[in-house]
Amino acid sequence: MEWNKTKSIFIVAFLILDIFLGYQFFQKWQATGKEYEVIKNDVEHDMKADHITYEGLNKEATEGYRITANQKSFSKEEIEALKDQKPLMDMPSDDHKVTSLKMKFANPIALSKKDIEDDAQALVSSKIQDGEKYKLWKVDKSKKEIIFFQTYEGHYIYQKTDNPSNMIGQVVLHLNGKNEVVSYDQTTLETFKQIQKESLITEMDAVELLYYQNQLKEYSTVKSCKFGYVAQYPLTSTQVLAPVWRITVEYEKKVNGEKKTVQEYFTVNALESTILDTDQ
């Protein structure tokens, strides 16, 4: 009888302790949430004080994937099927894989100077294998090149353009002095697979990270924040693509005594909250 009574007292005591600890945890959770909101509000206030402006940045949490993809090897049949083109590299064989095409057009293809971007996109879509998978990245007049990046579900797979070894899913058109396309290089990713779904930082989180890391200058403007992917290990045959936010920031600086508008670009890992790259 005494044991049953003692057992009941212990059970009640533990229930009271659980309720007390649960209540304390709830209060702490509420306080943490409020502190987080205060910090977020303080950051936005500080950015405003530094005259850093932005519009339309998404603050809603989203989910996304890391992606795996394989580097495509082009077959002899695929290369021979390209009309009015000839290869500038050795053809594939049993002991020689071709993962980077270098092709020359039989006749140079003229591009309109007025509509060069549209004309170049149309050329890639119609003359190049899987051309619809590529989207214009930039026109480099100094190098006489037009660069396209491969996309996944409509989003850019961002890549370095200053090193051929980082060329994993690109088309580069080469122009002559008459604004004609004479040749191109191509690499392609294939067999895309989504890995486990994970939470992504928001567009606003990515911009605030830049601010935390002192990357945003006073009187600068966040012009855009676009979703895409970056290869984490571009030199491997199987690529792991991480979701990123590509942020464009604009500000003015004096060059030779004159004000000049400068654009700066940042790439932020949307899974790991890290700044991957900065360039102008």
UniProtKB/Swiss-Prot annotation:
This is Two-component system WalR/WalK regulatory protein YycI. Changing residue 10 to A: Induction of WalK-dependent genes. Disruption phenotype: Induction of WalR-dependent gene expression. Cell wall defect. Residues 27-280 are extracellular. Keywords: Cell membrane, Membrane, Transmembrane, Transmembrane helix. GO terms for cellular component: plasma membrane. It is a single-pass membrane protein. Coiled coil: none annotated. The chain crosses the membrane at residues 9-26. Together with YycH, regulates the activity of the two-component system WalR/WalK. Gene3D superfamilies: YycH protein, domain 3-like. It is found in: Cell membrane. InterPro entries: YycI-like. The transmembrane region is required for the regulation of WalK activity. Homodimer. Interacts with WalK and YycH. Residues 1-8 are cytoplasmic.
